[in-house]
Regions:
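Helix-interface capping motifs at the ends of transmembrane segments in multi-pass membrane proteins
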Residues: 14-20, 158-166
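Long, well-structured alpha-helical subdomains associated
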Residues: 162-163, 170-187, 202
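Alpha-helical transmembrane segments of integral membrane proteins
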Residues: 31-35, 180
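Hydrophobic alpha-helical transmembrane segments
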Residues: 21-31, 165-176
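N-terminal glycine-rich anion-binding loops that anchor highly charged ligand groups
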Residues: 35-42
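Polar-ligand-bearing catalytic/cofactor-coordination segments
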Residues: 2-22, 26, 42-146, 182-202
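Core segments of transmembrane alpha-helices
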Residues: 145-155
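Membrane-helix exit/interface motif
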Residues: 125-132, 153-163
């Protein structure tokens, strides 16, 4: 997912950008900060909706919803397991597991059911060899590497630029962030399709 950086780093970044000896990176700063703001807004909206629909109870848990949807789609080689964290739900095609967060796995709310069904939607995509899922899976290692490096590279780049050094390190950091941002847009068809499959089943 797109990484949200520390507010202090954002503040320092803006101040440095204003005093930097070059103006050639202005557009990159705008794109970077705009993308980070957008990702924060999307994340906040998602958490708000999840919290709202978590208050509406149903007779089954997220785990039961996931298991029943797998059964109805004749998928027998995928396991439903619990994973630590909040909204850390995902489908892992490598070991064929639907990983439901603690707030979904044992919860009997509409929100939990929707999230569980969405993740099983990815399992159905995998079982049916949905091509966009294959592309996303192939890009995951690259995106994970970019996500791990982007913070430190951006910080080093900012420091070097403030000291009058070459901006290429900062450019590299912005490029790494662009990779994670592009990944989010590339995988939109996968997410929309998984949601459509979940809604159809529900």
């Amino acid at each position: 997912m797109i990484e949200l950086f520390n507010i202090d780093l954002l503040s320092y970044t803006v101040q440095t950008a204003e005093t930097a000896p070059t103006h050639s990176y202005t557009i990159y700063w705008l794109i970077l900060l705009g993308s980070m703001l957008l990702s924060w807004l999307v994340s906040a909206r998602m958490k708000s909706r999840f919290s709202e629909y978590s208050q509406i109870s149903i007779p089954v848990t997220g785990r039961q919803v996931a298991e029943q949807m797998l059964k109805d789609n004749h998928i027998t080689d995928v396991k439903v397991i619990s994973t630590p964290g909040h909204l850390t739900d995902h489908y892992n095609p490598a070991d064929k597991t639907v990983n439901l967060s603690e707030s979904v796995y044992n919860s009997n709310s509409i929100a939990a059911a929707a999230v569980a069904a969405h993740e099983v939607g990815h399992a159905v995509q995998h079982a049916q060899a949905y091509h966009w899922l294959g592309l996303r899976s192939a890009l995951v290692p690259i995106v994970q590497l970019s996500s791990n490096l982007v913070g430190i590279v951006l910080m080093i780049g900012i420091v070097l630029l403030a000291m009058g050094g070459s901006p290429w390190v900062l450019g590299l950091g912005i490029g790494l962030f662009a990779v994670t941002t592009a990944f989010a847009f590339i995988t939109l068809p996968v997410e929309f399709d998984a949601s459509a499959r979940a809604l159809k089943w529900l």
